[in-house]
Amino acid sequence: MKKILSLCFLLSSLFVVSQQTFVLNPAMVNPEDAENFEMLIKKYGKKMAEDAVNDGLIQGWALLKRVPGMGKVEDEKINYLWVVAYESPKKYVNRQSWFNTEKKYGIPGEILFGGVDVERYGSFVYKTEKRYDNSLKAKFIIFNWTFPKNINSAMNVADKISSSFQKDMKKEGMASWGMATRIIPQDSDLAPLFFWDAYENMEQVIDHLMYKAAIKNVDQNLLSQLQEELPDGWDSRIVWEFVSSTN
């Protein structure tokens, strides 16, 4: 009976993951306004996001800040990113507005954030294909985009790789790993396959980028297979720092 219950829990968890939909909203915040912007988000935004989670409107929320000095200067124009997760595509399609400072605090958003210069760069919607999480608290997260030769076979190899390193995640400081496919927009110049790797500290992030940390024991044959599936490598890899998030 215990084994049956465990199997049922596993299957239900897999169903939730297979339905999860999340949105990336990149933005550029004037560096002179960054400190004030982060203070406002931590003081007002996080609580509204937590209320939205408790009310079942969203599954999770985070604000990320791009780690500077890790790439070309011109690529650092987009320096912040909102992430909002929904438990299913249906929840995303029927989403309701919840970021309302006037309703929550009696202060209109245009007044509260009026002194912050923020320029948004659209919305990018993804479907989670697989993910592993544990009780560690991530401070940094790597976002990886790629154009696979064949998306299904690439995901199959990535599935085998992730299954092989899951047991090493916690001891190597990896709090989360995931794989997702892009739903919208459908532009051909945007990479359709997306991965994330979240760690407790920057040293672990650097180790991961050198194929160490949680992935150091992955079978080299599997890594070679992945390289074959991703002939052009990573289209983009960006390291972000968590500013604020729901639990």
Language model features with spans:
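Short S/T/G/P-rich N-terminal loop/turn motif that feeds into the first structured element of a domain
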Residues: 18-102, 111-247
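Bacterial Sec-dependent N-terminal signal peptides
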Residues: 1-21
